[in-house]
Amino acid sequence: MKNLFYLFFTSLIALSCNQKSPEAQTSEAETPSLYIEWYGDNEVANEMVTRGIEHVMNVEFDKAFVLFEAAMQLDSTLFGPHVMLAQFSNANSENQEFHYARAKVLAADKNVNSKLFVSLLDEKNEKGKRQVWGADNHLIWKKMYENEPRGRFMRFWYTFGMAAEEGAEDALLKMLGDFKSEGSNYGPVLNNLGYFYMKNGNMDKAKEYFERYCQIRPNGYNSHDSMGEYYFNNKDYENSLLHYQMALDNYPAASNAKTMIAEIKTLMK
């Protein structure tokens, strides 16, 4: 069993050498930076953080939860996993407050954007939930992005929160082009564009971007979940069911896919 774990972790490290961190390192990486300081000295923990970030950007939060929890256990100095685990915790729970408190302590000597990242959790909503996303935090994401425009994670979530009148469409399309040219994972941007166009009533464009997302992430589950939602909103229940089933096949614990499959089957009776 120990040998199996060793092979698994060494494989993670080897794979990480061929992947860009979602938060880093463009051609300007040698200049002083204000990237969120996600990483520590444990290579395996760092790789788990990187993969956790990727799942967060792809809205695959349950997989991200497992990776951040494991990273935190391997390297107790990391604050970023605590931020995300606080986000994933239930409102007013002991876990939420524990992870928030640990994140503040561990980020105390980090750079300004790392501290701003933790500060996203400072205010609870009316239900007692600490959240890194939402309209109330948009200005903090904007400040983080302005501090370090090369940070892909910060840029992604700042742009995610932009309204149409702020220039969201142009910002998303520019980010898509930049991520592609950098060799970064651009699937999440396709997903956001799909939702942007669907929200604004351009169903043809929405379908185009959701289809592209499925094409570049065929083994993910959120890509098919998004495509399923598109078809569901357009009352094409057969294709919606097909994609929700694909999401469930790719990740049998995908709870939203299970719920939607049951709902669609009821509607199709």
Regions found by a protein language model. Name each.
Residues M57, A91, E126, G161-E165, ...:
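Register position in tetratricopeptide repeats
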Residues N42-E43, S76, A108-N111, E146-R150, ...:
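Short coil turns that delineate tetratricopeptide repeat
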Residues A64, Q96-F98, W133-N137, A168-L172, ...:
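Single-residue signature of alpha-solenoid repeat helices
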Residues D41-A70, L74, K115-W133, N147, ...:
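Alpha-helical segment of the N-proximal tetratricopeptide repeat
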Residues L121-D122, R155-Q215, N222:
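Alpha-helical adaptor scaffolds
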Residues A45, F79-G80, N113, P149-F153, ...:
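Helix-start (N-cap) detector for alpha-helical repeat units in TPR-like alpha-solenoids
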Residues A70-A71, R102-L106, W141-M144, M175-F179, ...:
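Canonical positions in the second alpha-helix
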Residues M84, M154-W157, N192, S226, ...:
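Canonical tetratricopeptide repeat
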